[in-house]
Amino acid sequence: MVLEMLNPIHYNITSIVPEAMPAATMPVLLLTGLFLLVWNYEGTSSIPGPGYCMGIGPLISHGRFLWMGIGSACNYYNRVYGEFMRVWISGEETLIISKSSSMFHIMKHNHYSSRFGSKLGLQCIGMHEKGIIFNNNPELWKTTRPFFMKALSGPGLVRMVTVCAESLKTHLDRLEEVTNESGYVDVLTLLRRVMLDTSNTLFLRIPLDESAIVVKIQGYFDAWQALLIKPDIFFKISWLYKKYEKSVKDLKDAIEVLIAEKRRRISTEEKLEECMDFATELILAEKRGDLTRENVNQCILEMLIAAPDTMSVSLFFMLFLIAKHPNVEEAIIKEIQTVIGERDIKIDDIQKLKVMENFIYESMRYQPVVDLVMRKALEDDVIDGYPVKKGTNIILNIGRMHRLEFFPKPNEFTLENFAKNVPYRYFQPFGFGPRGCAGKYIAMVMMKAILVTLLRRFHVKTLQGQCVESIQKIHDLSLHPDETKNMLEMIFTPRNSDRCLEH
């Protein structure tokens, strides 16, 4: 009898359920179960961030990056969730970090020497496993990096001072080419042409059409920025990316014509040692079978676009800051007079220009251009107590870190922020470690040579009190002015060398 009562078959289960649980309760239990499932998933990560929410969270976070731009989205998420947080890009877990201790750990270790980005996007712009900037294959990247390091140091760095200064002088003598009818100077175009001319003189040495290639470089950069984290489905709809594909092709075709001429000259050169430069070294490596032709072409392209792409914008922001801060301009001019006088700048002067160096550092801290770094974890790790799995994407929000830690007046532009030595873990405009910027030393040389040459000849002024704070900017892969807006030009007033401190 007892066994019969315990036997579930003895009962009609369908008649029992309605008595024990009303039909309306079933949806509630299902929703509760789903909630517990989601809660259990989210509980597997101790890192702050938005909820997974049945896959909706990753879609929203990736969508925010596409809508706001990478830089703006990073700042948003760090403000909301803290300085070490987690989102998703293309369904992959991605950390956004603005803590100096975490950045220091990541930059110094080899297992963070890879970047991340859409494979299809990088293939479209020619950077997938080629070149150096976004080459995500560590072994291939290690093959190309030494060519860049050699070209950007030693004799090349020494020559850069004279080459850069002479190029700017030549372009200033033709200032009317970038001056409109009102007498306003298109500073960005001027600086981009100087940067391209300087890079070509040192690394390729083939005559080129500066104005045409500068325009093509901007088109290439727009494509790079637009395609870097696009979802794969974007590339299945040809009309969506067709214009970017064309922009990339326009620049690559132009550069390949120059490289073809370089190859021809190398083949007819009797004394090869007299034509050795960055491009020649790469072409000879190709002949030895060390590099593919496609990789050689991409390396040369990246060397030519690097300075016009970022350094020109950095110098543009610096000139706007000088225009707003006459006391800083006066201090820089005094130092130029003391260290250099009326002669041309030389390599020995570079280290002596301390006021200018602090100005450059403070400009890059206060108004950065490249303010984030994208990396990928190549093995499991623990960072500041948080577990990081192999394959995790990481974005280092350097620009935000520069306004959060160490500096006495982080939200002001003032040289007081560099009055004392700043430990390098708190200031990383170029990064450091295995994947630090290969051109960080030559970049400082170029910026000092440009500023000395320009400021000793002209006093600069913005239009209608325009300043870096009021310029409308696009904050995506980098932070740069929105060039569709007006009043980005400047007024250049010739400076009387005998009265250069009157302004």
Swiss-Prot record:
Localization: Endoplasmic reticulum membrane; Microsome membrane
Effect annotated for changing residue 192 to H: In AROD; strongly reduced aromatase activity; 81% reduction of androstenedione metabolism compared to wild-type
Predominant cellular place of this UniProt entry's protein: endoplasmic reticulum
Enzyme class at the top of the EC tree: oxidoreductase
Cofactor: heme
GO molecular function: aromatase activity; electron transfer activity; estrogen 2-hydroxylase activity; heme binding; iron ion binding; oxidoreductase activity, acting on paired donors, with incorporation or reduction of molecular oxygen, reduced flavin or flavoprotein as one donor, and incorporation of one atom of oxygen; oxygen binding; steroid hydroxylase activity
Keyword Heme included in the entry's annotation: yes
Catalyzed reaction equations: testosterone + 3 reduced [NADPH--hemoprotein reductase] + 3 O2 = 17beta-estradiol + formate + 3 oxidized [NADPH--hemoprotein reductase] + 4 H2O + 4 H(+); androst-4-ene-3,17-dione + 3 reduced [NADPH--hemoprotein reductase] + 3 O2 = estrone + formate + 3 oxidized [NADPH--hemoprotein reductase] + 4 H2O + 4 H(+); androst-4-ene-3,17-dione + reduced [NADPH--hemoprotein reductase] + O2 = 19-hydroxyandrost-4-ene-3,17-dione + oxidized [NADPH--hemoprotein reductase] + H2O + H(+); 19-hydroxyandrost-4-ene-3,17-dione + reduced [NADPH--hemoprotein reductase] + O2 = 19-oxo-androst-4-ene-3,17-dione + oxidized [NADPH--hemoprotein reductase] + 2 H2O + H(+)
Record annotation: effect of changing residue 264 to C: 1.6 fold decrease in affinity for androstenedione substrate; slightly affects PKA-mediated reduction in catalytic activity as measured in vitro by estrone synthesis from androstenedione (49% decrease compared with 36% for the wild-type protein); no effect on PKG/PRKG1-mediated reduction in catalytic activity in vitro
Pathway it works in: Steroid hormone biosynthesis
InterPro entries: Cyt_P450, Cyt_P450_CS, Cyt_P450_E_grp-I, Cyt_P450_sf, Cytochrome_P450_Monoox
Protein keywords: Disease variant, Endoplasmic reticulum, Heme, Iron, Lipid metabolism, Membrane, Metal-binding, Microsome, Monooxygenase, Oxidoreductase, Pseudohermaphroditism, Transmembrane, Transmembrane helix
PTM annotation: Phosphorylated in vitro by PKA and PKG/PRKG1. These phosphorylations inhibit the catalytic activity as measured by estrone synthesis from androstenedione (36% decrease for PKA and 30% for PKG/PRKG1).
Residues noted as binding heme in the record, renumbered to the chain: 437
Residues binding substrate, per UniProt: 309, 374
Stated consequence of mutating residue 435 to C: In AROD; 1.1% of wild-type activity
Effect of residue 437 to Y: In AROD; complete loss of activity
Record note on what altering residue 314 to P does: Found in deaf patients; uncertain significance
Any Gene Ontology biological process: negative regulation of macrophage chemotaxis
EC code(s) of this entry: 1.14.14.14
Chain segments annotated as transmembrane: 19-39, 303-323
Membrane topology: Multi-pass membrane protein
Biological function: A cytochrome P450 monooxygenase that catalyzes the conversion of C19 androgens, androst-4-ene-3,17-dione (androstenedione) and testosterone to the C18 estrogens, estrone and estradiol, respectively. Catalyzes three successive oxidations of C19 androgens: two conventional oxidations at C19 yielding 19-hydroxy and 19-oxo/19-aldehyde derivatives, followed by a third oxidative aromatization step that involves C1-beta hydrogen abstraction combined with cleavage of the C10-C19 bond to yield a phenolic A ring and formic acid.
Disease: Aromatase excess syndrome: An autosomal dominant disorder characterized by increased extraglandular aromatization of steroids that presents with heterosexual precocity in males and isosexual precocity in females.
Family to which the UniProt record says this protein belongs: Belongs to the cytochrome P450 family.
Protein name: Aromatase
